């Protein structure tokens, strides 16, 4: 699992389908 910070860019990069 990836331990990335809770940033808006990270969420969009990890789950772009959510924004689609």
Curated annotation (Swiss-Prot):
Name any cofactors this protein relies on. Fe cation
Catalyzed reactions per annotation:
2 superoxide + 2 H(+) = H2O2 + O2
The answer to whether the entry has keyword Iron is yes
| Cellular component terms (Gene Ontology) | periplasmic space
User: Keywords assigned by UniProt?
Assistant: Iron, Metal-binding, Oxidoreductase, Periplasm
Q: List the disulfide bonds.
A: none
Q: Which InterPro entries match?
A: Mn/Fe_SOD_N (IPR019831), Mn/Fe_SOD_N_sf (IPR036324)
List localization entries. Answer: Periplasm
Provide the GO MF annotations for this entry. Answer: metal ion binding; superoxide dismutase activity
> What's noted on cofactor binding?
Binds 1 Fe cation per subunit.
Q: What is its main location?
A: periplasm
Q: Does the keyword Nucleotide-binding apply?
A: no
Q: What are the EC numbers?
A: 1.15.1.1
Explain the purpose of this protein: Destroys superoxide anion radicals which are normally produced within the cells and which are toxic to biological systems.
Similarity section: Belongs to the iron/manganese superoxide dismutase family.
Q: Could you give the subunit structure recorded for this chain?
A: Homodimer.
The identity of this protein, by name, is Superoxide dismutase [Fe]
């Amino acid at each position: 699992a990836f331990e990335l910070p809770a940033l808006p860019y990270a969420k969009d990069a990890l789950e772009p389908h959510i924004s689609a």
